[in-house]
């Protein structure tokens, strides 16, 4: 009992209030822990039209919710505006927000060619044909050489910001991707465009040094710190409430300890926390 009293004396009052209220509420079997009125007050939750913490990747119209990725977005914007063609690898662990970054990039260019479905058969020919259709037209040439030459000619004749071509295949192994991009890269490097391939460090590790040397590889997308977690909360809450959520430092520290600051983990953590009040 004495040890419990000492422990309780070191806890913030808000956390104690949540713990005490949960002792009095018996959760339903198979459900999230119920959150009482005192829980809600302790967490300072505002009125919300919906739960803003969705685990889906951010889409184009949700780019304002992207947090902690300012540097990579600025670099891409600069290359597109100054018409500086290049091949890039956007590197990040699973859950770091690679796909969300690529979706948000759609705001940076008037023409974005996304590739997210990996072809099961002859992926090199299929991906090149799909690119050709979107760049040059529906009558795909019979040979790869003619196909590439016509894509190059079509892009050379354009003015304005460069098109952005992205590849995002998180479910494909690094060795298989390496084989595909060994053959694709000589074609991609001739296109007057920004080409971005999203890879996990594990996928990138399977690429040869020669292949990697053709690309500008970003530093891995970092996990979020406490300041960025608060910015993430603010950005999400603005989409569903006219009020902010004054989440306590203790709550944010708890979320960081549970997730390591990985964006996908943080989103699920706060989603479940808010769902628990329903």
Features from the language model and the residues they span:
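Conserved Walker B catalytic segment
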Residues: 149-197
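A short, basic N-terminal segment
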Residues: 4-84
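Helix-loop-helix "sensor" segment of P-loop NTPases
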Residues: 203-254, 271-274
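The conserved phosphate-sensing helix
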Residues: 258-271
């Amino acid at each position: 009992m004495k040890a419990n009293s000492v422990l309780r004396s070191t806890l913030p009052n808000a956390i104690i209030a949540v713990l005490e209220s949960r002792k009095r509420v018996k959760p339903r079997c198979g459900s999230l822990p119920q959150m009482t009125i005192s829980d809600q007050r302790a967490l300072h939750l505002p009125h919300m039209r919906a739960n803003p913490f969705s685990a889906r990747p951010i889409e184009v119209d949700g780019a304002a919710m992207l947090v902690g990725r300012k540097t990579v977005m600025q670099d891409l914007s600069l290359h597109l505006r100054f018409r500086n063609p290049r091949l890039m690898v956007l590197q990040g662990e699973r859950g770091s927000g690679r796909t969300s970054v690529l979706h948000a990039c759609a705001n940076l260019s008037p023409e974005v060619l996304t590739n997210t479905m990996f072809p099961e058969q002859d992926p090199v020919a299929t991906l090149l044909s799909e690119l050709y259709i979107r760049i040059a037209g529906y009558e795909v040439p019979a040979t790869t050489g003619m196909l590439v030459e016509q894509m190059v000619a079509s892009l050379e004749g354009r003015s304005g910001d460069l098109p952005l071509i992205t590849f995002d295949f998180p479910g494909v192994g690094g060795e298989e991707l390496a084989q595909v991009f060994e053959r694709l890269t000589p074609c991609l490097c001739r296109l007057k465009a920004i080409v971005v391939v999203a890879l996990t460090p594990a996928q990138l590790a399977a690429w040869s040094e020669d292949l990697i040397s053709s690309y500008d590889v970003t530093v891995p997308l970092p996990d979020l710190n406490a300041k960025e977690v608060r910015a993430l909360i603010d950005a999400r809450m603005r989409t569903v409430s006219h009020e902010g959520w004054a989440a306590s430092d203790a709550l944010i520290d708890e979320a960081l300890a549970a997730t390591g600051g990985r964006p996908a983990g943080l989103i699920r953590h706060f989603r479940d926390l808010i769902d628990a009040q329903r």
